[in-house]
Amino acid sequence: MADGKERPIHENHRARMQERVAHNGMESLAEHEVLEYMLYLAIPRHFGSFCRVMEATPQELMQVKGVGPRSAQLISDIMEFGRYYAVKKRKKQATLDTTANAIEYIKPLFLGLQNEVLYIILMDDSCHPLYDLKAAEGVPNHVSIDTRKLLRDVLRSNASTAILAHNHPTGPALPSATDQLTTLKIMQLLAPAGISILDHIIVAGENACSMADRGRLPDISAHPGILNAASTDF
């Protein structure tokens, strides 16, 4: 009997929320109502904010009472869809010949990511992007790169220039000593293939910085050694 009484109440509530959105848009809803409207779930008190819900893993979401595997996966996929949309919306004829253009192009790649990811933006000699190569992905502050696979993938692109880009999920958008070493190793790896690394962009949330602009991009002529290992940790 209790279940039978609850259903109409919830259905009427959902109908009222749908009417509000139809007439006044999503902005008419409170933050917790956005999630409730989307999946008819409990308010996001467990995570503290809408953004944290969107960034949570399916396993974390399922710790909330009433959230099953399908709902958890759907919430998780929404962030993926958002990132996919942002990446696809970028200008197709972009020229990454300025720091501002490079950052604008690169930032969507890291939207909502909680793990550290390293990309190599492969370009022609006019700085037109050819391909966004995901070189490595790992836990925050640590990635491992298969250098042989990386070199094979890069050579297939016919690129002549490139920009490195990675995110700091838990830290500021500032280059560390490890970031500089990573940059140098990749420069050494790609130099024999005729590919020049023009910059390394670091993204942290809404912030980003250029190692080249900060004078932190390594001078490969001062470190001519070649990276021979099949894989390396950064």
Where are these regions (language model features)?
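Charged, compositionally biased N-terminal leader segments and the immediate start
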Residues: 1-41
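Amphipathic, charged-and-aliphatic alpha-helical interface segments
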Residues: 31-55, 72-88
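Long, charged amphipathic helices and adjacent flexible linkers at domain junctions
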Residues: 86-102
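Histidine/lysine/aspartate-rich catalytic loop segments that bind and position anionic ligands
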Residues: 103-157, 161
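Charged helix-capping and loop-helix junction motifs
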Residues: 146-148, 177-184
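Histidine-centered catalytic micro-motifs
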Residues: 161-172, 196, 202-203
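Divalent-metal-activated hydrolytic enzyme cores
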Residues: 184-234
